Amino acid sequence: MNKIYCILFLSAQCLVHMGKCEPNQKPSRLTRSAKNVLLEQEPMVERSTRMSNPWKAFMEKYDIEKTHSSGIRVDLGEDAEVGNSSYRIPAGKCPVFGKGIVIQNSEVSFLTPVATGNQKLKDGGFAFPQANDHISPISIKNLRERYKENPDLMKLNDLALCKTHAASFVMEMDKNSSYRHPAVYDEDKKICYMLYLSAQENMGPRYCSKDAENKDAMFCFKPDKNETFDHLAYLSKNVVNDWQNKCPRKNLGNSKFGLWVDGNCEEIPYVQDVQAKDLRECNRIVFEASASDQPTQYEEELTDYQKIQEGFRQNDQGMIKSAFLPVGAFNSDNFKSKGRGYNWANFDTENKVCYLFNAKPTCLINDKNFIATTALSHPQEVDNEFPCSIYKDEMEREMRKESRNMSLYNVDKARIVLPRIFISNDKDSLKCPCAPEHITNSTCNFYVCNCVEKRAEIKENNEVAIKEEFKQDYQYAQGESKNQMLLIIIGITGGVCVVALASMFYFRKKAHNDKYDKMEQADGYGKPTTRKDEMLDPEASFWGEEKRASHTTPVLMEKPYY
């Protein structure tokens, strides 16, 4: 067995070494003379071909399509069954800071409870009506008192607790429904509001009336980020509990979003520019242009205002669902954005221009005249701390990794492999073949090496792609990597099978030998109080009988009780 394990171990080591090898790995670069004497003593410096992005982890929360996965301006990204009907409900995974609902030509706040009983339709808002159990609005202090026996809820931050509270209530008419109410959290007053209505926009003379005097007509409303909503956060049932780590909140000062292109963060070339007097206005503009799940068409039957009025007065969900609990986007277009839209912007504080774009940013450019913002971000809060050491730290990590690989595989140690990072606040670490250029607007004192040929470029759709002349190298490397991975998987699978077969053979042989070993235990035979199945020794004599004739074939016998 030890030999088998040694063989398997050596095979695994061989496969690991094969997996680590680079497809275009060059032989040792030691140069010899005619007499085989080493001429080069200085280590050779070369540039790695691997294109890694030091911003990858930092920028994960700004991948809004992945982190939020639903509309922002209007969030109706999920369907829920209630009874026999399908409703659209908010489903975003991140809070939308500063978002509220404006009821046009009305002084009523959307956080006012919906109209019930004899109230006029326009006297109410969107919030949950009064109930026997006071569940909304409710302060965070009272929420923590309410759930003090639940340690898991007590660990949640205020926004997560508000969302969880609102999502804990089910429809009376269908307790098995996945329908859950959205919520709004007031950070100034520390109050949690449950929203009775999931709809966020209803516009157009065909569907609503802006006439403030007509109190019983359907009111018009739309989402907005204005100054009165700065302290609010709109929450769906899907907001993650650790949203601080996974979602953007503060805008990024001294920064603008960019695209990582083979060693440097470059500006996004294709953008929409809009004049904006300040950051708040730019944030509001990007919110208006952001991902939206709002349907573009509605069913013609949405003109029966009397039915909707009665629905509110009688608290009849079936009557009001056409307007406020949208049934499959009003049975016309069930559009879901999945978070795709103009969700990002760079605000130029000097020229007062807001640059919008719909491509996921992959890095940050350090620029003292810019602020990077998103449609999810707070309208005013700014974090001015730029991670100045990110490039230097990544270069040191990459070089330590290369050094370990060289030591492990006995690669020529007279070789230094530099990572493909051409920007840093440590000019000497760039090892640039030309004089590095100093970035004037940088608050981090960055230098960039512009004389190394880039292997990637930005296309017209703001996507980064490898240049044609280098594609074959990376395709070959990817193919080799897949082949090596396949070899490793095959090797591991084969090794497991060999170990299993060897183990089975070993234990079967051991069990077989144990049976024969009992033939040497003649002294124990014939004891009247013992009942065992044993192999009969040819010299044994049971119960006064003569010896057995067979001296070659052991026989399994059972001793009777006396």
Curated annotation (Swiss-Prot):
- The main location class comes to membrane
Keyword field: Disulfide bond, Glycoprotein, Malaria, Membrane, Signal, Transmembrane, Transmembrane helix
Q: Where in the cell is it found?
A: Membrane
List, alphabetically, the GO terms of the cellular component aspect: membrane
Residues annotated as transmembrane: 485-507
The stretches that face the Cytoplasmic side, renumbered to this chain, are 508-562
How does the protein's chain sit in the membrane according to the entry? Answer: Single-pass type I membrane protein
User: What InterPro entries does the database record attribute to this sequence?
Assistant: Apmem_Ag1, Apmem_Ag1_dom_sf
Ranges of the Extracellular topological domain: 22-484
Please give the residue ranges the record annotates as the region Disordered: 519-543
- Disulfide linkage: 94-247, 162-192, 208-220, 265-363, 282-354, 388-444, 432-449, 434-451
Sites carrying a glycan are 84, 176, 226, 405, 441
The domain of life is Eukaryota
Q: Does the keyword Transmembrane apply?
A: yes
Say yes or no: keyword Zinc-finger present.
no
Q: State the signal peptide span.
A: 1-21
Q: Name one Pfam family in it.
A: AMA-1
What the protein does comes down to: Involved in parasite invasion of erythrocytes.
In the record, the note on similarity to other proteins reads: Belongs to the apicomplexan parasites AMA1 family.
Protein name, as recorded:
Apical membrane antigen 1
Q: What is the lineage of its organism?
A: Eukaryota, Sar, Alveolata, Apicomplexa, Aconoidasida
What gene makes this protein? AMA-1
